[in-house]
């Protein structure tokens, strides 16, 4: 066990020579490909980061444009809705106005018809009253009178009846 703790200068010399030879061979054949691979990997990672940042920036730009478009579309929709509501209100008001005018015309026409029927009924009643009055007067008096006198008498009677009513 003592031999392991005691340094052997020959062994140390050959270990150093082997180590230096290993370093030389690694440097000559392995370090360049390893460093090249590491640099390539580093460049790829750097490029991927740059591409990701550009993609993120582009996405944010597109999002901002879409937000502006959405805002504009929303404003246009609100304006269209307001226009449609205004048009609907105008049409409703026009329909109400037309309906009122139509009902007023119908009422006026009905009043005219009622007045015409009333006048016609009054004429008929006046004629019947006149005929009855002439017949009654002729029966009471037992005399036949002329049509002018009959008409004047009937007019007076009808006027009296209308004034009393």
UniProtKB/Swiss-Prot annotation:
Similarity comment: Belongs to the ATPase B chain family.
UniProt-listed InterPro entries: ATP_synth_B-like_membr_sf, ATP_synth_b/b'su_bac/chlpt, ATP_synth_F0_bsu_bac, ATP_synthase_B_chain
Cross-referenced Pfam families: ATP-synt_B
Ranges that cross the membrane: 11-31
Organism: Elusimicrobium minutum (strain Pei191)
Bilayer disposition of the protein: Single-pass membrane protein
Protein name (Swiss-Prot/TrEMBL): ATP synthase subunit b
Keywords on record: ATP synthesis, Cell membrane, CF(0), Hydrogen ion transport, Ion transport, Membrane, Transmembrane, Transmembrane helix, Transport
GO molecular function annotations of the record: proton-transporting ATP synthase activity, rotational mechanism; proton-transporting ATPase activity, rotational mechanism
Assembly information from the UniProt record: F-type ATPases have 2 components, F(1) - the catalytic core - and F(0) - the membrane proton channel. F(1) has five subunits: alpha(3), beta(3), gamma(1), delta(1), epsilon(1). F(0) has three main subunits: a(1), b(2) and c(10-14). The alpha and beta chains form an alternating ring which encloses part of the gamma chain. F(1) is attached to F(0) by a central stalk formed by the gamma and epsilon chains, while a peripheral stalk is formed by the delta and b chains.
Higher taxonomy: Bacteria, Pseudomonadati, Elusimicrobiota, Elusimicrobia, Elusimicrobiales
UniProt xrefs under HAMAP family: ATP_synth_b_bprime
């Amino acid at each position: 066990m003592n031999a392991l703790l005691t340094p052997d200068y020959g062994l140390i010399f050959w270990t150093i020579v082997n180590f230096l030879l290993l370093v030389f061979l690694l440097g000559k054949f392995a370090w360049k490909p390893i460093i090249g691979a590491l640099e390539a990997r580093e460049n790829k990672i750097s490029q991927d980061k740059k591409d990701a940042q550009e993609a993120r920036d582009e996405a944010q730009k597109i999002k901002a444009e879409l937000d502006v478009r959405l805002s504009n579309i929303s404003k246009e929709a609100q304006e269209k809705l307001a226009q449609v509501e205004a048009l609907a209100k105008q049409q409703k008001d026009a329909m109400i106005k037309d309906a009122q005018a139509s009902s007023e015309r119908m009422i006026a026409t009905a009043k005219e018809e009622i007045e015409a029927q009333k006048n016609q009924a009054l004429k008929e009643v006046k004629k019947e009253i006149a005929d009855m009055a002439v017949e009654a007067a002729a029966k009471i008096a037992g005399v036949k009178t002329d049509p002018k006198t009959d008409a004047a008498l009937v007019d007076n009677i009808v006027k009296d009846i209308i004034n009393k009513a």
